[in-house]
């Protein structure tokens, strides 16, 4: 009917939170069925999960009377959520200085990576383009002198970065070395990431000789040091649940500005203290390089409970019914 169509939220190119939609449908079906026997239920539906759990944060839990909670965030039947990582975004600002540099302006692009969601696919052994750029810059610095004019990679902290671009200033006599370094590193990385990220490409495109503003040598070394040492990937696997990533981080956003290098990492852990310790590691690294660090969007972990009568009951009932 027309009224039913008006009540439906529609869009193109998005699932509209399909997993949460299933949970809402479950709850409405139970509430709508007068034949079901169950204790008093409180069905809680919040908004804006993906952009920071804003609805959940705004919820006044004092109005709730229940003592047990069931999380219905799974998009697949037969799966029950029993734990969830907490997280935060850690933003680093590392001050840098520029000076006039004369040389051939050269663009280095690391591309072709699979990327993915840092919460769901951090265990897939996929490379992060920002981290690979740090490796390239370090390797190049072992063989020749250069400076950095620009640097950027990624737009979302929770996405494993697919590409990163650096604009360098090199002497004309060092261009060949830059291309050799790129070719060798590309070959090595495709071997290292065989089966998970074999499409990695590192391209070097030379421009014309110019006099431009580029990082001072001290600032360049700070940037490279940060990229090489900033944490990425799995920090710790769970000791209780086989195959579960307990703690991880992802360097999702990287941008060289006029006065500082800016970066944002997504930090996750299903153990609250482990999340804090990993964030502290980012803070210490940033402050060691003379920078400042800020946490944003901090939300708590839902830690695994080894003994849970409700979980065991739900598993038994599911097996009995299906």
Question: Predicted regions: what is each one?
Answer:
Residues 10-50, 106-110, 117-140, 251:
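Alpha-helical metal-binding/catalytic segments enriched in His/Glu/Asp
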Residues 14-101, 149, 238-242, 246:
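Acidic/histidine-rich catalytic neighborhood of metal-dependent amide-processing enzymes
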Residues 61-129, 186-190, 248, 260, ...:
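Metal-dependent peptidase/peptidase-like ectodomains
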Residues 110, 168-172, 265-269:
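Short beta-strand-to-loop capping motifs
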Residues 119, 149-161:
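A structural signal for small-residue-enriched, beta-sheet-centric alpha/beta enzyme cores
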Residues 205-250, 255-258, 272-277, 292-322:
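An extended, acidic, His-containing surface patch that forms the Zn2+-binding/catalytic region
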């Amino acid at each position: 009917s027309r009224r039913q169509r008006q009540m439906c939220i529609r869009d193109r190119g998005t699932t509209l939170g399909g997993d949460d939609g299933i949970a809402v449908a479950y709850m409405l079906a139970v509430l709508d069925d007068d034949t079901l026997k169950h204790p008093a239920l409180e069905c809680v539906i919040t908004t804006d999960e993906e952009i920071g759990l804003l609805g959940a944060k705004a919820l006044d839990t004092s109005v709730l009377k229940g003592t047990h909670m069931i999380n219905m965030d799974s998009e697949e039947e037969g799966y029950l959520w029993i734990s969830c990582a907490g997280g935060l975004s850690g933003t680093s600002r590392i001050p840098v200085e520029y000076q006039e540099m004369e040389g051939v302006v050269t663009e280095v692009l690391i591309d072709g990576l699979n990327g993915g969601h840092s919460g769901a696919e951090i265990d897939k052994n996929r490379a992060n383009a920002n981290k690979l750029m740090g490796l390239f810059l370090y390797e190049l610095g072992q063989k020749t002198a250069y400076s950095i004019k620009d640097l950027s990679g990624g737009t979302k902290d929770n996405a494993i970065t697919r590409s990163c671009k650096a604009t360098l200033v090199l002497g004309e006599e060092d261009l060949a070395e830059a291309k050799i370094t790129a070719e060798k590193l590309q070959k090595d990385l495709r071997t290292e990431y065989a089966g998970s990220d074999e499409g990695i490409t590192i391209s070097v495109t030379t421009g014309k000789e110019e006099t431009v503003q580029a990082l001072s040598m001290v600032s360049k070394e700070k940037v490279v040091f940060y990229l090489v040492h900033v944490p990425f990937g799995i920090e710790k696997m769970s000791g209780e649940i086989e195959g579960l990533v307990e703690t991880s981080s992802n360097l999702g956003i990287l941008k060289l500005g006029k006065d500082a290098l800016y970066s944002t990492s997504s930090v996750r852990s299903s153990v609250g203290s482990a999340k804090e310790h990993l964030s502290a590691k980012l803070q210490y690294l940033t402050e060691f390089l003379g920078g400042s660090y800020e946490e944003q969007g901090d939300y708590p972990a839902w830690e695994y409970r080894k003994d849970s009568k409700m979980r065991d009951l739900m598993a038994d009932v599911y097996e009995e019914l299906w």
